[in-house]
């Protein structure tokens, strides 16, 4: 939202793969959590088609008119019909607003700057490439003069376009806004009067859909919601396409059929899907280079700023893991890591892995500081429990309400995330945020084909931990017992009723199955099984010290 339109395409990273392009004239549903880049995607489309609109008019080529609508403008409305009517009016208003936008000489200069840079980079349309090449031959002043002449010349194509818009605005538009309830036929009429004479098409970009009242997405008595009615009406017009920004698994995420458009997913869970890492990391490196190059106004490679190479990108991988596919958070962490590097050496040298780790620890601490001391104690106890189980995932039956305060804070500051919602007798599986794992030294990866902790946390040397620690109030109480140590079973009698444990203090401890805590008494255990216990020491009649393991947790 903070970027000017002429800068959007310089900073835009194409999230699509394969034959699908980000600026195809097609129906698209853009899905992603808050901060994943949905608005950037739609604004880039708006900038792209706005930059090419007047050049296409000048060359008598078919035009595509972009209309960008933020539905948050209607979040104060409650009645679904009123929301529907307001959107119809907004579509027509925005078509006319584009016309006014194009009349400004200053705006034409900015659009010229955008137009001469975008065509070679983004367009696969031969006509647009030719137009772009001709534009590059003109200076900004010459471009504005050419458009001004076309605007002032009677019969000029741009003049004709502006006249049509002005005449429509004087008659039909004012009538709709002032005197009667709008109908979808008004949009059809506006298309026929304003765009069809120029062999034109309309691209409607709907942003912030999730901000409007949920009733807009609920089915009425006839079976369809007003949202579905609107989308079906737009879908049936051959020269209209829509691109929508939707939060997944919310009330607005109801368009499941492909007739409403292909889905562009703006999330990437690179930890749990390492096969996505390679293509995603290329996009991240491109983002780094685009943002820095734009800021310093000269080309800059990521290797000039970060201590990375083609063979070693562990530094970037840590940022990718911590961002969880959230672009806004990624940029924040990039900024924070650069700040850590600057504080470390006053701007000399590159950003190194230690700077990234410090930035992630700071992020984890900042997240924790959002909570009261009792909540922090609860978090610390769960994290300690998970650490003894060599995981960062857990389930905690009947604690959903308590845990929800850590999962519902925001998309960027949730210390705990939901990995899998509980169904039936299966409980919900939670996991700690990656930055918080770094802050609390929680393990996230095993070394490949083993259960040894991979401290590098890399997909090259390790696999993400899938183990889920099963928490109960009893186990939570045990995790807070002072003096407990870790150990490993070294010997069991035939019926497994007793045996010996070697503690991490290198002492041998006798144990009986009666010493196992109630929550774990039914769990299987075997030689080399990891346990946690409270060491107890007794002196027998011969004054020999006997070491016994009590309060045993089977890990």
Predicted regions and their residues:
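OB-fold/S1-family single-stranded nucleic acid-binding modules
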Residues: 536-555
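The catalytic "switch" region of P-loop NTPases
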Residues: 181-312
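C-terminal leucine-rich, beta-strand-based interaction scaffolds used for sensing/assembly
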Residues: 322-325, 329, 339, 346-484, ...
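Conserved AAA+ ATPase small/helical "lid" subdomain
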Residues: 105, 109, 285-350
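A short, basic N-terminal segment
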Residues: 1-28, 52-57
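Short nucleic-acid-contacting surface segments enriched for D/E, G, S/T with interspersed K/R
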Residues: 516-534
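P-loop NTPase nucleotide-binding core
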Residues: 26-27, 32-202, 212, 248
């Amino acid at each position: 939202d903070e970027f000017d339109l002429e800068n959007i395409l310089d900073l835009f990273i194409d999230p699509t793969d394969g034959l699908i392009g980000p600026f195809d004239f097609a129906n698209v549903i853009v899905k992603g959590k808050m901060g994943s880049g949905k608005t950037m995607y739609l604004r880039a489309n708006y900038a792209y088609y706005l930059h090419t609109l007047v050049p296409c008019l000048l060359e008598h080529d078919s035009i595509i008119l972009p209309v960008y609508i933020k539905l948050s403008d209607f979040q104060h409305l409650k009645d679904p019909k009123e929301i529907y009517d307001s959107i119809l009016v907004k579509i027509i208003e925005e078509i006319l607003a584009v016309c006014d936008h194009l009349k400004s000489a200053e705006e034409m200069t900015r659009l010229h700057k955008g137009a001469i840079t975008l065509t070679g980079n983004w367009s696969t349309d031969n006509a647009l490439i030719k137009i772009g090449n001709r534009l590059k031959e003109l200076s900004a002043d010459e471009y504005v003069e050419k458009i001004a002449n076309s605007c002032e010349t009677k019969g000029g194509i741009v003049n004709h376009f502006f006249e049509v818009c002005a005449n429509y605005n004087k008659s039909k538009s004012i009538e709709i806004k002032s005197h009667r309830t709008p109908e979808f036929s008004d949009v059809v009429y506006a298309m026929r009067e304003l765009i069809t004479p120029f062999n034109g098409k309309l691209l409607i970009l709907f942003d912030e859909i999730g901000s409007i009242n949920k009733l807009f997405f609920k089915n009425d008595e006839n079976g369809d919601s007003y949202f579905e009615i609107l989308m079906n009406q737009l879908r049936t017009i051959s020269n209209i396409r829509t691109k929508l920004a939707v939060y997944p698994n919310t009330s607005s995420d109801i368009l499941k059929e492909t007739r409403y458009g292909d889905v562009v997913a703006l999330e990437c869970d690179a930890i749990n899907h390492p096969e996505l890492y390679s293509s995603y990391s290329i996009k991240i490196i491109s983002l780094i280079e685009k943002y820095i190059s734009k800021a310093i106004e000269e080309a800059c490679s990521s290797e000039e700023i970060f201590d990375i190479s083609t063979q070693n990108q562990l530094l970037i991988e840590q940022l990718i893991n911590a961002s969880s596919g959230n672009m806004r958070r990624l940029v924040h962490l990039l900024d924070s890591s650069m700040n850590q590097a600057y504080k470390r050496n006053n701007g000399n040298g590159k950003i190194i892995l230690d700077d990234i780790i410090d930035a992630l620890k700071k992020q984890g601490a900042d997240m924790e500081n959002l909570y009261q001391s009792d909540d922090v104690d609860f978090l610390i106890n769960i994290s300690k429990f998970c650490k003894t189980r060599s995981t960062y995932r857990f389930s905690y039956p009947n604690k959903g309400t308590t845990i929800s305060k850590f999962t519902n804070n925001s998309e960027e500051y949730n210390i705990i995330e939901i990995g899998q919602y509980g169904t039936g007798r299966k409980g919900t599986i939670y996991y700690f945020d990656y930055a918080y794992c770094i802050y609390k030294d929680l393990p996230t990866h095993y070394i490949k084909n083993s259960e040894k902790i991979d401290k590098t946390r890399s997909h090259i040397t390790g696999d993400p931990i899938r183990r889920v620690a099963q928490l109960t109030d009893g186990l939570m109480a045990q995790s807070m017992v002072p003096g407990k140590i870790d150990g490993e079973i070294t010997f069991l009698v035939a019926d497994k009723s007793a045996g010996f444990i070697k503690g991490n203090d290198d002492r041998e401890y006798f144990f009986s199955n009666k010493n196992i805590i109630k929550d774990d008494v039914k769990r299987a255990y075997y030689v080399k099984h990891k346990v946690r216990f409270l060491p107890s020491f007794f002196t027998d009649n011969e004054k020999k010290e006997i070491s016994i393991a009590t309060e045993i947790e089977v890990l």
